[in-house]
Design a protein with these regions (language model features):
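A helix-coil-helix interface module used to build multimeric assemblies
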Residues: 4, 9-206, 212
Length: 212
């Protein structure tokens, strides 16, 4: 198995280099951000494959160790998508197949590239949204603290660019804190939407394998 065999868009003719560069030029760079999530999704997928009998316990153990080894390489910055390899999904499968033989090819059983990509993106979004929620909560707590700290410090309240009534710096900080409450609800809602597993949709019309 060589890298060029993992290129899905290879249809037996040489593509126009300018068109290829325009359409997929940044794909590998962007895919690198999904690498650890691809491994994470594959670890869950092979556990399911063993559960329904498509993998033996020995194969599951072997593949799990292989995927965790790749995850360590990603974390250490030693993982790269080879020039002739389509994307991160193909690269992970290629590395497993080189190291483990035919067992490496089995990780694609019961899933399509379509739902595999969606899994990676949802895991990525879920992680990013969690970090965003943590950052917003930190800012909210800080503003709430400043609101309490400066609640007795007066400042003018304006309306239509004119001084309207007495206010305080505490109320000013608190107002900004309150605006973040809705933001945190929106982030939480987005996280719940991202936290849905698309595996099983395969290429778009379900999998013929009765996956769990």
């Amino acid at each position: 198995l060589v890298g060029s065999e993992m290129c899905i868009r290879d249809r037996g003719f040489e593509p126009d280099k300018m068109i290829e560069e325009y359409t997929v030029g940044d794909d590998r760079e962007l895919d690198m951000r999904l690498a650890k999530y691809d491994v994470e999704g594959s670890l869950a997928h092979i556990a399911m494959l063993e559960k329904i009998g498509l993998l033996t316990s020995a194969e599951l153990e072997e593949l799990t160790a292989g995927l965790k080894e790749i995850a360590a390489e990603i974390e250490a910055g030693r993982f790269a998508i080879e020039p002739d390899t389509e994307d991160v999904h193909s690269q992970v499968e290629l590395m497993l197949t080189r190291r483990l033989g035919d067992a490496g090819k089995k990780i694609h059983s019961g899933r399509s590239r379509n739902d595999q990509v969606l899994v990676d993106l949802k895991l990525f979004l879920r992680d990013e949204l969690r970090q965003t929620a943590d950052a917003v909560k930190t800012l909210f707590d800080r503003l709430q603290g400043l609101s309490e700290q400066y609640k007795e410090v007066l400042m003018p309240g304006y309306t239509h660019l004119q001084i309207a009534m007495p206010s305080s710096f505490g109320l000013w900080f608190g107002a900004y804190a309150e605006t973040l409450v809705d933001d945190m609800r929106l982030v939480a809602a987005a996280w719940h939407i991202a936290n849905q597993n698309p595996l099983g949709s395969a290429a778009g019309y379900l999998s013929l394998i009765h996956i769990s």
